[in-house]
Amino acid sequence: HRETIEMFRRVRDKNNIPAAVMLDTKGPEIRIKNFKDGKTELKAGQTFVLTTAEVEGTNESVSITYKALPEQLKIGNKILIDDGRISMEVTDLTATDIVCKVLTGGEISNHKGVNVPYVHLDFPYLSEQDEKDLVFGVKMDVDFVAASFVRSKEDVIEIRKFLDYYGGHHIKIIAKIENMEGVQNFDEILKHADGIM
């Protein structure tokens, strides 16, 4: 990435083009893991299990990346996968499994995002990878950080403090609103971010 940024800046400066460099964080996200065949088909009405156990995904179950998810959900919660293309309702919970009824079926493939609307999930905003990426961004003197999956003003404040600590006071934060919690907290996020995406 360093070479790409340096090349971009050389071309920008040579041609006197006003263009900025933005670093996009991964953000706090939950994803499904892998299916045996890379994908499967889910039908409305069927039972499907999201599990913290390491399993090879089938049309009956798949592993998820966030181990504490079962303990933070309740029966009746809705779960959206792949930007809402697949929807489910939680019907039962164990220490490792989230048993769901598929509401909206379709094809589902490896590494799709998992979203739980109206449920505050208690996990840290900045991952270890995000921290490494932000330090790199400060070293490369990026102009903006696109902060993925911002849920509240606290997420923006956490990034601001982190950037400031490493000398990135000038870096502007663009909050990416990508879930229901972010929508619900839109006004407070807007007051603390330099922009919204």
Predicted regions and their residues:
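Non-catalytic helical/linker scaffolds that mediate oligomerization, partner binding
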Residues: H1-M197
